[in-house]
Amino acid sequence: MITLNNIPLSFLYDVPKAVDHKNIILNLIQKIPPNKYNAISHTDVNLPEGFHREYTIYFLKNIYQQFKQKFLEHLGETHMDLHNIWFQWYNQNDYHPWHVHPWCHFTN
């Protein structure tokens, strides 16, 4: 295993009840009115900061907290920041050009 300063660089986290969470989150996303942006069929990336995003509340409460705890334990750290959450729903022929975001170190 590759390490950096004795910290293993690989980390695997299986979300408990992932399929159930996925279905709930997809249903919550579908409550957001259709919002095409560039060549993406549906997203909230361009909606106002104060726009109600029920899926983020669900994600933070039911997935993120447990993930964060395990990830920080793995790193031997006590703090990490989450700056933003958004979704992008792609249909056939949708696309988004390659790009990077400052302060983003992983996505899924």
What do these predicted ranges mean?
Residues 1-77, 95:
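Non-heme Fe(II)/2-oxoglutarate
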Residues 75-85:
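A short coil-to-beta-strand element that immediately follows conserved catalytic motifs
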Residues 84-108:
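Catalytic core of non-heme Fe(II) oxygenases with the double-stranded beta-helix
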